């Protein structure tokens, strides 16, 4: 089998990494459906910037919610998974999203978390963190 140009072998994700990716995609889909049922409009999913990624950007009336989705074995485990470092990356990414979407700059902004666990309804944590922390 020929090697790709440059001689490097292509990276192959471990089965654990593939499973985590699929779990994340499924959790984000559940979270988006839950938000839509609550009257939010999804503006972006998996929005990437050089600073980080925002799982979901959602709007309801004059509010923009930047939502971090966490899927774990329990809702409590999911709640502890949003670390201060991740919070700062999401805040930085949100600034990038707002720069790319200046029409939303005057909206109220909020940083939420959506906690997902098997056999549980999603838990939407409003204002889970803010840009001043």
Curated annotation (Swiss-Prot):
CDD domains with a match to the protein in the record: PoNe_Nuclease
Entry's transmembrane regions: none
GO molecular function, a single term: nucleic acid binding
Protein family according to the UniProt entry: Belongs to the UPF0102 family.
Record-linked PANTHER family: UPF0102 PROTEIN YRAN
HAMAP family from the UniProt entry: UPF0102
UniProt name for this protein: UPF0102 protein bll0669
């Amino acid at each position: 089998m020929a090697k790709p140009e440059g001689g490097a072998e292509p990276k192959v994700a471990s089965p654990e990494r593939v499973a985590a990716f699929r779990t994340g995609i499924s959790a984000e889909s559940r979270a988006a459906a839950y938000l839509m049922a609550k009257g939010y409009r999804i503006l972006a999913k998996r929005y990437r910037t050089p600073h980080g990624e925002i799982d979901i950007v959602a709007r309801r009336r004059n509010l923009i919610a930047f939502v971090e989705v966490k899927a774990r074995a329990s809702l409590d485990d999911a709640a502890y998974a949003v670390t201060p470092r991740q919070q700062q990356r999401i805040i930085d990414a949100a600034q990038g999203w707002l720069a790319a979407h200046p029409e939303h700059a005057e909206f109220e902004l909020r940083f939420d978390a959506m906690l997902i666990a098997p056999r549980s309804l999603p838990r939407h944590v409003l204002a889970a963190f803010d840009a001043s922390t």
